[in-house]
A protein has these predicted regions:
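Alpha-helical membrane-anchoring segments
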Residues: 2, 19-508
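Residues at secondary-structure transition points
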Residues: 8-11, 212
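Soluble N-terminal domains of membrane-associated systems
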Residues: 13-14, 26
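Intrinsically disordered, low-complexity, repeat-rich regions
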Residues: 1-2, 10
Length: 508
């Protein structure tokens, strides 16, 4: 005991003093600062952990294939916002002011959703594009992919918002991108369920092709060059079209088999298909699909569903698959041919389903003024030239006499009011400019804005090079009829082909 006491007493005084000082209680200021710092840090860490669990970022960190997929989805966000940034008029308040605004049927009564002016919209889209690049950079620079996944989720929400604000932006590759992004973000076991999403999208693409345009080869046989790099023989083109349908139906089923060479054969067939189809459809679809397919099926050594357990959050993913599949077949339950009426087609991954020729006519009368506007999109003229016209023409009458006849290249005005903007129709893609909803929405907005005495609209369409014409809309007085558009069901004011129409127009 004495030796121990002597040892204790022999310690340096400064050590004993330090021990005493360390046992003194901290001041109130020090206590508050440390508590606040701990609380903020704790909350941030809690949010970070919640986001990690939400997006399963550790899974992406471990698998370079998932990083490539995430990078491709971010790159596509950048491409999308860059394309929209180039012409944002219709996404801003300027679109409504200039009569160049056509929201999706789901939000047709929500004009207030476009609340930013032209400059604000353009700047906002630019920022989203830069955020996509930031996410892409962080994905390969930072150890954690959490920032990239959070930015991908933010960009997907913004894309959906602007996408619905102008249905003329609708394209199958944007539908694909949104589905893939949603599945990638919400799933655990991401690689397996992303492969399932690819398989589902191929099957849904095949469902859209169940029409004479593809089953009988009418789509590509109606084109002057038919299919590139193949002989210009009708039966061969038809066989190739049917072969694509078979591949999209059967190919994903091969991923379930334990036969490795069959899985690899299917994988190789899809890669070759996307490389070839890029010659026809261009960069957008190919840039999305080709890298995703290659990245997703690297190291595809086991059947797709081997060891799969559907539980927890993946029940939600399976629910998304179910909703998507229902959307893909929804148009079959609406009477009429979706190639003509477009009813229900946007709930699925709508593809190139037919070539279209469109003629739209609008008669506008107010007081002693009368306009007849004609819109042609790839319309084969009835004269001897046989040319396909894509133009807009107007005849203006005053007091019953023709006062002017001109090609429409600028908005038509009556005083300060715009009654027709050619950009509303010229900016629509091939799969959109045949949609009766586009012309319905124009007439509805014209009646609301201009309050004319009478508006009459007529819409004629031809599919796949057929010379026979189908009249889809014939409304002599739009204001008096006051039709409504329901995106979920049959709209009676859209006429269906009669018995005198060619069989190709009466499908199914």
């Amino acid at each position: 005991m004495r030796d121990a006491r002597n040892c204790l007493d022999s310690r340096p005084a400064r050590e004993i003093n330090a021990r005493v000082i360390s046992t003194q209680p901290p001041s109130n200021a020090d206590t508050d600062e440390s508590c606040n710092a701990g609380t903020v840090a704790g909350r941030l860490e809690g949010v970070r952990n919640w986001l990690r669990g939400l997006f399963q970022s550790e899974e992406v960190d471990r698998d370079p294939r998932l990083k490539i997929i995430c990078g491709c989805l971010l790159l596509y966000c950048h491409m999308t916002f860059y394309f929209w940034w180039q012409s944002p008029e219709a996404l801003s308040t300027l679109g409504n002011e200039t009569f160049n605004y056509a929201p999706a049927g789901l939000i047709q009564n929500f004009r207030w959703l476009a609340f930013m002016d032209y400059f604000q919209t353009r700047t906002y889209l630019y920022v989203q594009g830069m955020l996509a690049l930031l996410g892409l950079f962080s994905l390969f620079y930072l150890r954690s992919s959490l920032l990239a996944l959070c930015l991908l989720a933010w960009l997907a929400v913004n894309k959906v918002f602007f996408y619905l604000c102008d249905f003329r932006l609708f394209a199958n590759y944007h539908h694909f991108h949104l589905l893939y992004t949603l599945v990638f973000l919400i799933s655990s076991d991401k690689l397996r369920f992303f492969r399932c999403a690819l398989g589902l999208s191929y099957i849904m693409s095949a469902l859209v092709k169940l029409s004479p345009s593809w089953l009988f080869g009418e789509y590509f046989n109606s084109l002057p060059d038919k299919l590139p790099l193949l002989p210009k023989v009708n039966w061969l083109v038809t066989a190739a079209c049917v072969g694509v349908i078979v591949l999209e139906f059967i190919g994903p089923l091969c991923w379930l088999t334990s036969i490795r060479w069959l899985r690899r054969l299917s994988f190789g067939a899809f890669v070759l298909f996307h490389i070839y189809s890029g010659v026809i459809v261009g960069f957008w679809y190919t840039t999305l699909m080709l890298p995703l397919v290659v990245a997703a099926f690297l190291g595809f050594d086991e059947p797709l569903l081997k060891g799969c357990r559907i539980r927890g959050r993946n029940i939600v993913t399976v629910g998304v698959f179910g909703v998507a599949l229902m959307g893909g077949v929804y148009h079959f339950f609406i009477p009429g041919d979706a190639r003509l009426t477009s009813e229900g087609r946007y709930f699925g991954l709508f593809m190139f389903d037919a070539t279209r020729s469109v003629r739209f006519e609008a008669d506008i009368q107010k007081g002693n003024k009368y306009w007849t506007v004609q819109v042609y999109r790839r319309w084969q003229m009835d004269d001897d030239s046989g040319e396909n016209a894509s133009a807009i023409h107007c005849d203006f009458y005053q007091d019953g006499r023709l006062a002017n006849s001109f090609a429409v290249r600028q908005p038509i005005r009556d005083g300060d009011e715009i009654i027709f903007n050619p950009a509303m129709f010229a900016s629509a893609r091939m799969r959109i400019y045949g949609d009766p909803y586009l012309y319905y929405y124009y007439a509805r907005e014209l009646v609301r804005r201009y309050q004319p005495d009478r508006v009459a609209i007529r819409l004629d369409q031809r599919l796949d090079g057929h010379k026979e014409t189908v009249r889809l809309i014939d409304i002599p007085d739009f204001g008096q009829l006051n039709p409504a558009y329901n995106p979920f069901s049959r709209n009676e004011w859209i006429q269906l082909p009669g018995d005198e129409s060619p069989p190709a127009y009466r499908w199914p």
